[in-house]
Amino acid sequence: MNNSVREPTRGRRGSPPVADAALSVNPPLSVVLAGGGTAGHVEPAMAVADALRALDPQVRITALGTSRGLETRLVPERGYHLELITPVPLPRKLTGDLARLPLRVWRAVRETRAVFEVVEAHVVVGFGGYVALPAYLAARGIPRVRRRIPVVVHEANARAGIANRVGVRTAERVLSAVPGSGLRGAEVVGVPIHATITTLNRPALRADARKHFGFTDDARVLLVFGGSQGAVSLNRAVAGAAEDLAASGVAVLHAYGLKNTLELRTPEYGEPPYVAVPYLDRMDLAYAAADLVICRSGAMTVAEVSAVGLPAIYVPFPIGNGEQRLNALPVVNAGGGLVVADADLTPGLVARQVVRLFSDPAQLAAMTAAAARVGHRDAAHHVAKVALDLARAERDTASGRSAGGKP
Protein backbone atom coordinates (compact mmCIF):
# COMPACT_ATOMS: atom_id res chain seq x y z
CA MET A 1 0.00 0.00 0.00
CA ASN A 2 1.12 3.56 -0.69
CA ASN A 3 2.88 4.82 2.41
CA SER A 4 0.82 8.02 2.28
CA VAL A 5 -2.30 5.97 3.09
CA ARG A 6 -2.86 4.65 6.60
CA GLU A 7 -5.46 2.14 7.71
CA PRO A 8 -7.98 2.85 10.52
CA THR A 9 -6.38 3.42 13.90
CA ARG A 10 -9.11 1.54 15.81
CA GLY A 11 -9.15 4.13 18.56
CA ARG A 12 -5.39 4.31 19.08
CA ARG A 13 -4.44 7.28 21.20
CA GLY A 14 -1.27 8.10 19.35
CA SER A 15 1.37 10.47 20.60
CA PRO A 16 1.86 13.56 18.42
CA PRO A 17 5.08 13.65 16.43
CA VAL A 18 7.95 15.22 18.31
CA ALA A 19 8.53 18.72 17.00
CA ASP A 20 11.93 20.34 16.90
CA ALA A 21 12.70 23.32 19.07
CA ALA A 22 12.07 25.82 16.30
CA LEU A 23 8.57 24.49 15.66
CA SER A 24 7.54 23.90 19.28
CA VAL A 25 6.80 27.61 19.83
CA ASN A 26 4.79 28.03 16.65
CA PRO A 27 3.88 24.60 15.21
CA PRO A 28 2.60 24.27 11.64
CA LEU A 29 -1.12 24.64 11.14
CA SER A 30 -2.85 21.28 10.81
CA VAL A 31 -5.92 20.96 8.57
CA VAL A 32 -8.02 17.81 8.17
CA LEU A 33 -10.09 17.52 4.98
CA ALA A 34 -13.08 15.17 5.18
CA GLY A 35 -14.31 14.56 1.67
CA GLY A 36 -14.22 10.94 0.58
CA GLY A 37 -16.33 8.59 -1.49
CA THR A 38 -17.19 10.07 -4.87
CA ALA A 39 -15.26 12.46 -7.10
CA GLY A 40 -17.80 15.12 -6.16
CA HIS A 41 -16.51 14.99 -2.59
CA VAL A 42 -12.84 14.20 -3.22
CA GLU A 43 -12.03 16.71 -5.97
CA PRO A 44 -13.20 19.81 -4.04
CA ALA A 45 -11.15 18.62 -1.07
CA MET A 46 -8.06 18.25 -3.25
CA ALA A 47 -8.60 21.68 -4.79
CA VAL A 48 -8.73 23.15 -1.29
CA ALA A 49 -5.60 21.19 -0.35
CA ASP A 50 -3.73 22.77 -3.25
CA ALA A 51 -4.98 26.22 -2.23
CA LEU A 52 -3.96 25.63 1.39
CA ARG A 53 -0.44 24.73 0.32
CA ALA A 54 -0.25 27.79 -1.93
CA LEU A 55 -1.29 30.07 0.94
CA ASP A 56 0.87 28.34 3.58
CA PRO A 57 3.59 25.97 2.30
CA GLN A 58 4.18 24.71 5.87
CA VAL A 59 0.59 23.66 6.51
CA ARG A 60 0.04 20.03 7.50
CA ILE A 61 -2.75 18.54 5.37
CA THR A 62 -4.47 15.27 6.23
CA ALA A 63 -7.24 13.80 4.10
CA LEU A 64 -9.81 11.57 5.77
CA GLY A 65 -11.37 8.74 3.77
CA THR A 66 -12.34 5.08 3.60
CA SER A 67 -11.04 2.11 1.66
CA ARG A 68 -14.17 2.14 -0.52
CA GLY A 69 -13.80 5.59 -2.03
CA LEU A 70 -11.94 7.16 -4.93
CA GLU A 71 -9.74 8.93 -2.39
CA THR A 72 -7.54 5.83 -2.08
CA ARG A 73 -6.29 6.63 -5.58
CA LEU A 74 -6.85 10.37 -5.99
CA VAL A 75 -5.35 11.61 -2.72
CA PRO A 76 -1.94 9.86 -3.00
CA GLU A 77 -1.78 10.83 -6.69
CA ARG A 78 -2.01 14.47 -5.64
CA GLY A 79 0.73 14.03 -3.04
CA TYR A 80 -1.33 14.23 0.14
CA HIS A 81 -1.53 11.95 3.18
CA LEU A 82 -4.69 9.87 3.62
CA GLU A 83 -6.03 8.40 6.86
CA LEU A 84 -8.66 5.66 6.49
CA ILE A 85 -11.63 5.16 8.81
CA THR A 86 -14.56 2.75 8.91
CA PRO A 87 -17.13 3.57 6.18
CA VAL A 88 -20.49 4.88 7.37
CA PRO A 89 -22.91 4.75 4.41
CA LEU A 90 -25.65 7.32 4.92
CA PRO A 91 -29.26 7.38 3.78
CA ARG A 92 -30.20 10.36 1.65
CA LYS A 93 -32.91 11.26 4.16
CA LEU A 94 -33.26 11.13 7.92
CA THR A 95 -34.69 7.62 8.26
CA GLY A 96 -34.33 4.64 10.56
CA ASP A 97 -31.39 3.40 8.50
CA LEU A 98 -29.01 5.73 10.33
CA ALA A 99 -30.34 4.61 13.72
CA ARG A 100 -29.41 1.03 12.86
CA LEU A 101 -25.76 1.94 12.42
CA PRO A 102 -24.74 3.15 15.90
CA LEU A 103 -21.84 0.74 16.29
CA ARG A 104 -20.36 1.61 12.92
CA VAL A 105 -20.78 5.32 13.55
CA TRP A 106 -19.22 5.03 17.01
CA ARG A 107 -16.25 3.10 15.62
CA ALA A 108 -15.68 5.65 12.84
CA VAL A 109 -15.90 8.54 15.29
CA ARG A 110 -13.41 6.86 17.63
CA GLU A 111 -10.97 6.27 14.76
CA THR A 112 -11.39 9.86 13.59
CA ARG A 113 -10.67 11.25 17.05
CA ALA A 114 -7.45 9.24 17.10
CA VAL A 115 -6.45 10.79 13.77
CA PHE A 116 -7.19 14.27 15.10
CA GLU A 117 -4.94 13.62 18.11
CA VAL A 118 -2.06 12.26 16.06
CA VAL A 119 -2.04 15.13 13.54
CA GLU A 120 -2.91 17.74 16.20
CA ALA A 121 -5.76 19.06 14.07
CA HIS A 122 -6.50 22.78 14.30
CA VAL A 123 -9.51 22.76 11.95
CA VAL A 124 -11.69 20.26 10.10
CA VAL A 125 -13.12 21.05 6.66
CA GLY A 126 -15.98 18.77 5.64
CA PHE A 127 -17.42 18.33 2.16
CA GLY A 128 -20.33 16.03 2.97
CA GLY A 129 -20.74 12.32 2.42
CA TYR A 130 -20.08 9.36 4.66
CA VAL A 131 -16.60 10.51 5.65
CA ALA A 132 -17.73 13.94 6.83
CA LEU A 133 -20.28 12.78 9.41
CA PRO A 134 -17.75 11.00 11.69
CA ALA A 135 -15.44 13.99 11.32
CA TYR A 136 -18.12 16.43 12.43
CA LEU A 137 -19.05 14.27 15.41
CA ALA A 138 -15.42 13.66 16.40
CA ALA A 139 -14.68 17.40 16.33
CA ARG A 140 -17.21 18.05 19.08
CA GLY A 141 -15.48 18.59 22.38
CA ILE A 142 -16.31 17.64 25.94
CA PRO A 143 -15.65 20.38 28.52
CA ARG A 144 -12.56 19.64 30.65
CA VAL A 145 -12.12 16.30 28.85
CA ARG A 146 -11.48 16.85 25.16
CA ARG A 147 -10.98 20.06 23.23
CA ARG A 148 -13.40 21.06 20.52
CA ILE A 149 -11.97 21.43 17.01
CA PRO A 150 -13.37 24.17 14.76
CA VAL A 151 -15.35 22.94 11.74
CA VAL A 152 -15.94 24.40 8.28
CA VAL A 153 -18.75 22.87 6.23
CA HIS A 154 -18.80 23.14 2.44
CA GLU A 155 -21.87 22.02 0.49
CA ALA A 156 -21.33 21.55 -3.25
CA ASN A 157 -24.89 20.58 -4.18
CA ALA A 158 -27.99 22.72 -4.35
CA ARG A 159 -29.67 20.45 -1.82
CA ALA A 160 -27.60 19.60 1.26
CA GLY A 161 -27.11 15.99 2.31
CA ILE A 162 -27.60 14.55 5.77
CA ALA A 163 -23.94 14.77 6.84
CA ASN A 164 -23.71 18.49 6.22
CA ARG A 165 -27.11 19.09 7.80
CA VAL A 166 -25.64 17.54 10.94
CA GLY A 167 -22.33 19.37 10.58
CA VAL A 168 -23.79 22.88 10.42
CA ARG A 169 -25.20 22.54 13.93
CA THR A 170 -21.77 23.09 15.45
CA ALA A 171 -19.78 24.55 12.53
CA GLU A 172 -17.93 27.85 12.81
CA ARG A 173 -18.39 28.59 9.11
CA VAL A 174 -20.83 27.25 6.53
CA LEU A 175 -20.05 27.65 2.82
CA SER A 176 -22.10 26.58 -0.18
CA ALA A 177 -21.85 26.39 -3.95
CA VAL A 178 -25.20 28.02 -4.73
CA PRO A 179 -27.96 29.83 -2.84
CA GLY A 180 -30.79 27.83 -1.34
CA SER A 181 -28.84 24.80 -0.13
CA GLY A 182 -30.99 24.62 2.98
CA LEU A 183 -28.04 25.25 5.30
CA ARG A 184 -28.66 28.13 7.67
CA GLY A 185 -26.15 30.96 7.45
CA ALA A 186 -24.37 29.56 4.39
CA GLU A 187 -22.08 31.90 2.47
CA VAL A 188 -22.12 31.29 -1.30
CA VAL A 189 -18.57 30.77 -2.57
CA GLY A 190 -18.92 28.26 -5.41
CA VAL A 191 -17.34 24.82 -5.72
CA PRO A 192 -13.56 24.46 -5.23
CA ILE A 193 -12.08 23.23 -8.51
CA HIS A 194 -8.57 22.49 -9.73
CA ALA A 195 -6.28 25.37 -10.64
CA THR A 196 -5.80 24.02 -14.17
CA ILE A 197 -9.46 24.92 -14.72
CA THR A 198 -9.70 28.15 -12.72
CA THR A 199 -6.64 29.61 -14.45
CA LEU A 200 -7.65 28.43 -17.92
CA ASN A 201 -7.46 31.10 -20.61
CA ARG A 202 -9.66 29.58 -23.31
CA PRO A 203 -8.96 32.10 -26.09
CA ALA A 204 -5.19 31.85 -25.58
CA LEU A 205 -5.24 28.04 -25.61
CA ARG A 206 -7.88 27.54 -28.29
CA ALA A 207 -5.63 27.11 -31.32
CA ASP A 208 -3.40 24.54 -29.60
CA ALA A 209 -6.41 22.74 -28.12
CA ARG A 210 -8.14 22.42 -31.47
CA LYS A 211 -4.96 21.21 -33.11
CA HIS A 212 -4.63 18.62 -30.34
CA PHE A 213 -8.05 17.13 -31.16
CA GLY A 214 -7.83 17.58 -34.93
CA PHE A 215 -10.20 20.52 -35.39
CA THR A 216 -9.61 23.55 -37.59
CA ASP A 217 -9.16 26.96 -36.00
CA ASP A 218 -12.54 28.16 -37.27
CA ALA A 219 -14.49 25.00 -36.38
CA ARG A 220 -17.73 25.15 -34.43
CA VAL A 221 -17.09 22.59 -31.70
CA LEU A 222 -19.64 20.82 -29.51
CA LEU A 223 -18.20 19.10 -26.41
CA VAL A 224 -20.19 16.17 -25.00
CA PHE A 225 -19.45 14.28 -21.79
CA GLY A 226 -21.39 12.56 -19.04
CA GLY A 227 -18.83 12.38 -16.26
CA SER A 228 -16.04 9.85 -15.89
CA GLN A 229 -18.41 6.95 -16.65
CA GLY A 230 -20.21 8.65 -19.51
CA ALA A 231 -23.98 8.79 -19.91
CA VAL A 232 -25.82 6.35 -22.17
CA SER A 233 -28.71 8.68 -22.93
CA LEU A 234 -26.35 11.49 -23.96
CA ASN A 235 -24.35 9.06 -26.07
CA ARG A 236 -27.40 7.81 -27.96
CA ALA A 237 -28.91 11.23 -28.55
CA VAL A 238 -25.77 12.98 -29.76
CA ALA A 239 -24.50 10.06 -31.84
CA GLY A 240 -27.96 9.83 -33.40
CA ALA A 241 -27.76 13.50 -34.35
CA ALA A 242 -24.31 13.16 -35.94
CA GLU A 243 -25.52 13.40 -39.53
CA ASP A 244 -27.59 16.54 -38.91
CA LEU A 245 -24.78 18.14 -36.93
CA ALA A 246 -22.25 17.40 -39.66
CA ALA A 247 -24.59 18.80 -42.31
CA SER A 248 -24.74 22.04 -40.32
CA GLY A 249 -20.96 22.26 -39.99
CA VAL A 250 -20.74 21.30 -36.32
CA ALA A 251 -17.69 19.34 -35.14
CA VAL A 252 -18.07 17.12 -32.07
CA LEU A 253 -15.71 16.10 -29.27
CA HIS A 254 -17.48 13.27 -27.43
CA ALA A 255 -16.24 11.48 -24.29
CA TYR A 256 -18.58 8.50 -24.10
CA GLY A 257 -17.27 6.74 -20.97
CA LEU A 258 -14.78 3.99 -20.24
CA LYS A 259 -17.47 1.34 -19.78
CA ASN A 260 -19.56 2.30 -22.81
CA THR A 261 -19.39 1.86 -26.56
CA LEU A 262 -20.49 4.32 -29.21
CA GLU A 263 -21.96 3.45 -32.59
CA LEU A 264 -21.25 6.11 -35.19
CA ARG A 265 -22.06 6.44 -38.86
CA THR A 266 -19.22 6.52 -41.36
CA PRO A 267 -18.53 10.21 -42.02
CA GLU A 268 -18.72 11.66 -45.51
CA TYR A 269 -15.61 13.14 -47.05
CA GLY A 270 -15.09 16.75 -46.00
CA GLU A 271 -17.47 16.66 -43.04
CA PRO A 272 -16.44 18.24 -39.73
CA PRO A 273 -14.74 15.69 -37.46
CA TYR A 274 -16.66 13.68 -34.89
CA VAL A 275 -13.94 12.83 -32.36
CA ALA A 276 -15.10 10.10 -29.97
CA VAL A 277 -12.93 9.01 -27.04
CA PRO A 278 -13.68 6.91 -23.94
CA TYR A 279 -12.22 9.47 -21.56
CA LEU A 280 -10.72 12.96 -21.64
CA ASP A 281 -7.62 13.25 -19.47
CA ARG A 282 -7.06 16.88 -20.51
CA MET A 283 -10.31 18.64 -19.70
CA ASP A 284 -8.52 21.97 -19.92
CA LEU A 285 -7.85 21.34 -23.62
CA ALA A 286 -11.39 20.06 -24.15
CA TYR A 287 -12.87 23.20 -22.60
CA ALA A 288 -10.53 25.43 -24.59
CA ALA A 289 -11.47 23.72 -27.86
CA ALA A 290 -15.23 23.91 -27.30
CA ASP A 291 -17.86 26.53 -28.08
CA LEU A 292 -20.83 24.71 -26.52
CA VAL A 293 -21.29 21.79 -24.12
CA ILE A 294 -23.85 19.05 -23.59
CA CYS A 295 -23.36 17.43 -20.18
CA ARG A 296 -24.88 16.26 -16.93
CA SER A 297 -25.29 18.81 -14.14
CA GLY A 298 -23.42 17.40 -11.19
CA ALA A 299 -22.03 20.08 -8.91
CA MET A 300 -18.44 19.71 -10.13
CA THR A 301 -19.48 19.72 -13.79
CA VAL A 302 -21.58 22.86 -13.46
CA ALA A 303 -18.81 24.55 -11.48
CA GLU A 304 -16.14 23.79 -14.07
CA VAL A 305 -18.22 24.58 -17.15
CA SER A 306 -19.39 27.91 -15.76
CA ALA A 307 -15.96 28.81 -14.36
CA VAL A 308 -14.43 28.58 -17.83
CA GLY A 309 -17.35 30.52 -19.32
CA LEU A 310 -18.85 27.86 -21.57
CA PRO A 311 -22.55 27.87 -22.47
CA ALA A 312 -24.13 24.48 -21.90
CA ILE A 313 -27.15 22.30 -22.44
CA TYR A 314 -27.48 20.58 -19.07
CA VAL A 315 -29.21 17.19 -18.89
CA PRO A 316 -29.76 16.37 -15.19
CA PHE A 317 -29.33 12.77 -14.10
CA PRO A 318 -32.90 11.47 -13.80
CA ILE A 319 -32.38 9.42 -10.63
CA GLY A 320 -31.95 10.87 -7.15
CA ASN A 321 -33.50 13.77 -5.29
CA GLY A 322 -33.48 16.22 -8.19
CA GLU A 323 -30.34 18.00 -7.03
CA GLN A 324 -28.72 17.96 -10.47
CA ARG A 325 -31.47 20.14 -11.91
CA LEU A 326 -31.13 22.51 -8.97
CA ASN A 327 -27.35 22.64 -9.49
CA ALA A 328 -27.84 23.99 -13.01
CA LEU A 329 -30.57 26.53 -12.26
CA PRO A 330 -28.35 29.46 -11.16
CA VAL A 331 -26.45 29.29 -14.46
CA VAL A 332 -29.60 28.72 -16.50
CA ASN A 333 -31.50 31.55 -14.78
CA ALA A 334 -28.58 33.88 -15.48
CA GLY A 335 -28.76 33.02 -19.19
CA GLY A 336 -25.66 30.83 -19.35
CA GLY A 337 -27.32 27.56 -20.28
CA LEU A 338 -30.40 25.47 -20.92
CA VAL A 339 -31.89 22.53 -19.05
CA VAL A 340 -33.29 19.53 -20.94
CA ALA A 341 -34.90 16.61 -19.14
CA ASP A 342 -33.24 13.26 -19.76
CA ALA A 343 -36.52 11.82 -21.05
CA ASP A 344 -36.77 14.61 -23.64
CA LEU A 345 -33.25 14.19 -24.98
CA THR A 346 -33.58 12.82 -28.51
CA PRO A 347 -31.38 13.08 -31.61
CA GLY A 348 -33.90 15.49 -33.10
CA LEU A 349 -33.84 17.77 -30.07
CA VAL A 350 -30.03 17.75 -29.96
CA ALA A 351 -29.81 18.67 -33.63
CA ARG A 352 -32.40 21.46 -33.34
CA GLN A 353 -30.97 23.06 -30.21
CA VAL A 354 -27.32 22.84 -31.19
CA VAL A 355 -27.86 24.06 -34.74
CA ARG A 356 -30.09 26.89 -33.48
CA LEU A 357 -27.45 28.10 -31.03
CA PHE A 358 -24.59 27.88 -33.52
CA SER A 359 -26.74 29.75 -36.06
CA ASP A 360 -27.17 32.66 -33.64
CA PRO A 361 -23.68 33.93 -32.73
CA ALA A 362 -25.11 36.81 -30.71
CA GLN A 363 -27.08 34.49 -28.43
CA LEU A 364 -24.15 32.11 -28.05
CA ALA A 365 -21.89 35.03 -27.12
CA ALA A 366 -24.45 36.27 -24.59
CA MET A 367 -24.69 32.81 -23.04
CA THR A 368 -20.90 32.60 -22.88
CA ALA A 369 -20.70 35.92 -21.04
CA ALA A 370 -23.51 34.95 -18.66
CA ALA A 371 -21.87 31.64 -17.78
CA ALA A 372 -18.60 33.40 -17.03
CA ARG A 373 -20.36 35.90 -14.75
CA VAL A 374 -21.96 33.14 -12.69
CA GLY A 375 -18.89 30.91 -12.49
CA HIS A 376 -16.67 31.03 -9.39
CA ARG A 377 -12.94 30.79 -9.98
CA ASP A 378 -11.77 31.59 -6.46
CA ALA A 379 -13.79 29.11 -4.39
CA ALA A 380 -10.81 26.93 -3.41
CA HIS A 381 -8.83 29.98 -2.30
CA HIS A 382 -11.80 31.27 -0.30
CA VAL A 383 -12.39 27.97 1.52
CA ALA A 384 -8.67 27.59 2.22
CA LYS A 385 -8.40 31.09 3.68
CA VAL A 386 -11.39 30.50 5.95
CA ALA A 387 -9.83 27.25 7.15
CA LEU A 388 -6.41 28.79 7.79
CA ASP A 389 -7.89 31.73 9.71
CA LEU A 390 -9.77 29.35 12.01
CA ALA A 391 -6.75 27.06 12.34
CA ARG A 392 -4.51 29.96 13.28
CA ALA A 393 -6.96 31.15 15.93
CA GLU A 394 -7.25 27.62 17.34
CA ARG A 395 -3.46 27.21 17.44
CA ASP A 396 -3.10 30.48 19.31
CA THR A 397 -5.83 29.46 21.75
CA ALA A 398 -4.22 26.07 22.27
CA SER A 399 -0.88 27.75 22.96
CA GLY A 400 -2.59 29.88 25.58
CA ARG A 401 -4.15 26.83 27.20
CA SER A 402 -0.77 25.12 27.35
CA ALA A 403 0.91 28.18 28.80
CA GLY A 404 -1.77 28.42 31.47
CA GLY A 405 -1.62 24.74 32.30
CA LYS A 406 -5.24 24.15 31.32
CA PRO A 407 -6.46 21.03 29.45
Curated annotation (Swiss-Prot):
GO terms for biological process: carbohydrate metabolic process; cell division; cell wall organization; lipid glycosylation; peptidoglycan biosynthetic process; regulation of cell shape. UDP-N-acetyl-alpha-D-glucosamine binds at T38, A39, G40, N157, S228, Q324. It holds the Pfam family Glyco_transf_28. Its main location: membrane. The keyword Cell wall biogenesis/degradation applies. It is found in: Cell membrane. Residues 1-21 are annotated as: Disordered. This is UDP-N-acetylglucosamine--N-acetylmuramyl-(pentapeptide) pyrophosphoryl-undecaprenol N-acetylglucosamine transferase. It comes from Mycobacterium leprae (strain TN). The lineage of its organism: Bacteria, Bacillati, Actinomycetota, Actinomycetes, Mycobacteriales.
